[in-house]
Amino acid sequence: MTHDPKSIAVSYIEACGRKDFDAVAPLLSPDLKFVGPGNTLTGAAPYLAVLRRIGAVWVKSDVKKVLTDGQDVCVIYDFVTDTPAGAVPIVEWLRIEGGRIASVRLFFDRVAFKPASDEIAARANAGPRT
């Protein structure tokens, strides 16, 4: 595994967009810190659970720009959903330490994301799709 912060960040975003959360897991520090609109988590396992849950509506990540400053990487992308929300602009500020993502700061418009949030909840309550 590369320790280049930009490569790690892009691998993470691409794997998330493919819903390949098994590929995401080794990119995360076990004690990862996550801060986003309405949510704060500590630990890779709870964060992966959230990613898997939102995977229900996640079609792909359409990366627009990747900015780096040492161990900090900012990824700007459209979170493309299969909901009326469509593509929601997202910014993730990732801190890479020891070749793994140590922290994630997530920024997005909660109003624009609401149709996706509603659908995530509905699908979680409905159980697995057949």
Please tell me what each predicted stretch does.
Residues 1-130:
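C-terminal and inter-domain tail/linker signature
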